[in-house]
Amino acid sequence: MKNDTTTPSADAFPVERHAHWLLRLGLASVFVYMGIDKFMGSGVAEFSAMMNLPVILGFLVALGEIGTGLLVILGGLIKNRLGDAITRLGALGMVPILLGAIFMVHWGQWHFMSTASHPLGGMMFQMTLAMVAIYLLAKGNKA
């Protein structure tokens, strides 16, 4: 059988198998940071009040952000079906958190810069994060 020279082999791009970490670490670091940040300063109570949420729900959002970020990282470290499931579970948990942020805070403005009508900015950043989360949900550890 003849070797197909038009298709590059995995050996031609040895870093390709690690490229998924760019998506994982970028997405997970934002989630873990935002989750931890909700416990700092004025904390979960102020976040909950700003979002018109019960404090317990604000607490669960903060824990969800930390947990889903850690799951996406952990899933990438485990090279079997369990790791794939952990990656997908983490990404699945991120989607409703991001949709909540988009629809409750950022909807109506695309650009991320703050304005008088959207002091926390528009939904560009959250939509990008949602697309990365959906990609990891769809691809799992085959990303």
Regions found by a protein language model. Name each.
Residues K2-A143:
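Membrane-interface extramembranous regions
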